[in-house]
């Protein structure tokens, strides 16, 4: 029906636009400026992601920045949920927010890798998986001191767990798209890290910038 189709298009546009511009807010840069720290883009990989923010302003403020990034993911999913748009639009909001974080319109379409934002979307979509990821993510980083490896393995674990829950608990099948899409985006945004991991030259989080 034309009315239904136009309504769906409008819902998709509203969801995607809100998610992109919210996801693009560069909290790593904002927090660093507010506390008078070094610019995250001036060190390491040159991205305002979690590892560079940690190096630039220390663990306390990096945690604040990471939680704010996660909040962006939460909001991107909650907007379509509160508007009653359905799970497919929650997935759209989640994936677009991840893209917005990594391709931010506010800083010349650069950005981080999307890990914190993706975790925030997962907190709303499936909190159990969000909690289960944390020991994997943290354990890998503690063991290797390599943030990117924790992100890659944590996201893969979360994606597989999400797919398993869809099959076992009858969750909406579109969450399979969310699982595969979010993992794919995180891995794509980590391609340079993957290359360095394979060469054995990836940066450790405890290395001085």
Model-inferred region functions:
Residues 38-50, 106-119, 146-154:
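Short, non-helical or kinked segments that cap or interrupt transmembrane helices
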Residues 10-36:
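N-terminal signal-anchor transmembrane alpha helix
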């Amino acid at each position: 029906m034309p009315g239904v189709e136009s309504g769906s298009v409008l819902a998709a546009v509203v969801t995607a636009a809100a998610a992109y511009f919210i996801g693009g807010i560069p909290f790593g840069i904002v927090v660093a400026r507010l506390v008078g720290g070094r610019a995250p883009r001036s060190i390491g990989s040159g991205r305002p992601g979690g590892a560079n923010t940690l190096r630039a302003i220390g663990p306390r403020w990096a945690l604040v920045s990471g939680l704010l990034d996660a909040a962006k993911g939460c909001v991107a999913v909650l907007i379509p949920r509160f508007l009653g748009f359905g799970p497919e639009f929650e997935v759209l909001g989640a994936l677009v927010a991840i893209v917005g974080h990594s391709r931010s319109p506010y800083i010349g379409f650069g950005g981080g890798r999307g890990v914190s934002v993706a975790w925030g979307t997962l907190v709303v979509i499936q909190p159990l998986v969000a909690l289960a990821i944390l020991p994997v993510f943290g354990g890998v980083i503690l063991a290797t001191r390599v943030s990117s490896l924790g992100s890659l393995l944590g996201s893969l674990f979360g994606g597989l767990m999400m797919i398993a829950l869809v099959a076992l608990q009858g969750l909406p099948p579109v969450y399979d798209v969310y699982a595969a899409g979010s993992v794919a985006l995180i891995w794509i945004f980590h391609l340079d890290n993957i290359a360095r991991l394979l060469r054995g030259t990836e940066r450790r989080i405890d290395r001085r910038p």
